[in-house]
Amino acid sequence: MSSPLASLSKTRKVPLPSEPMNPGRRGIRIYGDEDEVDMLSDGCGSEEKISVPSCYGGIGAPVSRQVPASHDSELMAFMTRKLWDLEQQVKAQTDEILSKDQKIAALEDLVQTLRPHPAEATLQRQEELETMCVQLQRQVREMERFLSDYGLQWVGEPMDQEDSESKTVSEHGERDWMTAKKFWKPGDSLAPPEVDFDRLLASLQDLSELVVEGDTQVTPVPGGARLRTLEPIPLKLYRNGIMMFDGPFQPFYDPSTQRCLRDILDGFFPSELQRLYPNGVPFKVSDLRNQVYLEDGLDPFPGEGRVVGRQLMHKALDRVEEHPGSRMTAEKFLNRLPKFVIRQGEVIDIRGPIRDTLQNCCPLPARIQEIVVETPTLAAERERSQESPNTPAPPLSMLRIKSENGEQAFLLMMQPDNTIGDVRALLAQARVMDASAFEIFSTFPPTLYQDDTLTLQAAGLVPKAALLLRARRAPKSSLKFSPGPCPGPGPGPSPGPGPGPSPGPGPGPSPCPGPSPSPQ
């Protein structure tokens, strides 16, 4: 048994509480979200700590108690579901990141492929400039050669006469070299693509109404002047130009034609007619806007054709009797002169005053009568132009055949596969005569068309040709024999003035025992 002093030296060990507890109550620990992971790691053997009152100093000692298993299973299911959702979200984001990385890599490769290297871009630009320079040099050489064909030479303009617009700077800070010099602008000389035909016709009608009907005008003539009634000027309006009087044709792109149209549309008479008609003149308009005037660039030969390399079996006396005096007639002289000449925007009549002067000294022959022969090709072409005017015309052969006396000219529209016999039959029908009574020939080259089965294409009469007619001639080698007595000895009779042998005088046997020939 120990002494009291020994017991005083011993101290009693009191356990320290883990957390402050209210005296007289048991402490219950409340779990939050941060403790859910710790609870899962503890397993099913988790305990709930409860503080109970102690017999020493009122300090409660913790007491362990078993937690029910149903609460742990619900918590486990909740955490498993939440973990599954997080894993799925992480997987989807990972796949999206991988897809975007692949797209970025592909776009970077494409950018590297399309991005030209500086050296390659400079080389390509240099090749383009060299090609353009070669092309421009070739065009300059062609234009200089074209000008030299007409005896012209390009002079150009000095650099100090540039437009003020050439000194402007573009938005990129570079000078526009295309405006550094004055270049020809096609729009300054070309007509607008569209012409208001309705407005033009209305303006011409208004101008014609300004002239009093039956008005007269003093016209100078050789030896004085006379009053003439104003006759309407024929004006044909085509799709590509106009034609006043009998020509020449004035296309819309010609500057003089543009000035004429501008005067008409502004309500004035054309300035080129001011000298001939100072007080105005009415117009007789032919609306042919649906037709295109074909500009072949060559005027028809106004003179008389000549045959080269053909021998004429005529005597000199016959030629003198056939062509007495000068071969130049008044009509031929007028045909060599132009009808009208445009000088400084004015139409000058050439043939009119000269015709009036020659009319007093020598009568002018009648003009050649042109007769259009109605052919199947002409009827078909007329029907085609009415039904479908925009379709291109088929290849045709236009024949101009002059009669024997030169007073008539027959115009025939034929197909290239038609024959000479078809032409002969149509001419015989138009002239109301036998087809065998005339011959068809050409002067250059001198050709006589006798084969009626020969086509126009094979004869070289496409697309147009000028032919002549003449009376059919008998063969030159044909001889007619007439019965008669054979000449005896002595001087032989002369058969006639024509060529042929003439037996000379002297005895001898009869030259022909039968009938004597006499040339036709």
From Swiss-Prot:
SUPFAM superfamilies in the record: NSFL1 (p97 ATPase) cofactor p47, SEP domain (SSF102848), Ubiquitin-like (SSF54236)
Compartments where found: Cytoplasm, Cytoskeleton
GO molecular function, one term: ubiquitin binding
GO CC aspect terms: cytoskeleton; cytosol
Domain of life: Eukaryota
Record domain UBX: where: 392-469
SEP domain mapped to chain residues: 230-294
Principal localisation: cytoplasm
Gene3D superfamilies associated with the record: Phosphatidylinositol 3-kinase Catalytic Subunit, Chain A, domain 1, SEP domain
Sequence repeats: 487-494, 495-502, 503-510
Keyword Cytoplasm appears in the UniProt entry: yes
Residue ranges, annotated region (Disordered): 1-26, 476-520
One Pfam family per UniProt: SEP
Keyword field: Coiled coil, Cytoplasm, Cytoskeleton, Repeat
Bias kind Pro residues: ranges: 484-520
Subunit structure and binding partners: Interacts with GNA12, GNA13, RND1, RND2 and RND3.
Physiological role: May be involved in the reorganization of actin cytoskeleton mediated by RND1, RND2 and RND3. Promotes RHOA activation mediated by GNA12 and GNA13.
Protein name: UBX domain-containing protein 11
Organism: Homo sapiens (Human)
